[in-house]
Amino acid sequence: GQNIYPDRQMLLFAQDVLARVPGGTIVFDVKCSQRLAPAIRAAGGVALMYKTGHSLIKAKMRELDAPLGGEMSGHIFFKERWFGFDDGSYAGARLLEILSRAPNAAAVLEALPDSFSTPELNVACAEGEPHRLVAELQALADFAAPAQVNTIDGLRVDWPDGFGLIRASNTTPVLVLRFEGQTAAALARIEAELLALLRR
């Protein structure tokens, strides 16, 4: 078997919710897979990447009247047919509902687009250092096209074949890193580029 991480589960939840709420905005955090936004748009929704933090995602959902939001950490918020707060048991029930409609539940999960990715990596720092380091990295970031830089929450750099993220944790003095590539080689290249920037 394999772990189906929450950002991949969000692909299923978004498709399901958007079938009933066409054009809805789906909010997700900067740690989520690069494959999520295109899947949301393909299902007729609006994809909005936002800052990590369950209270921040929930507030943005309220602001935009979004029917669904989620984080890579596993906080999933359903406003469509529910109350808009994160509820693990309810998210599990919604996943079972989706799988129960398919003749082969395993095939539904196997069909989800996959990538090569790291889990969330934490680098311990002195108190106050993570935010200072991230501000320096944002100032140093100078990536050539086709790279796209996003500084809404740390430094996320997207390439056509993957992304890298360095951000400061909201709760502890650590840098949070995550890397994803569509191939193992892309993952290694992206990780090397971001770590080289971090070592400057």
Tell where the protein language model's regions lie, with residue ranges.
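Phosphate-binding and adjacent anionic-ligand microenvironments
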Residues: 19-178, 183-200
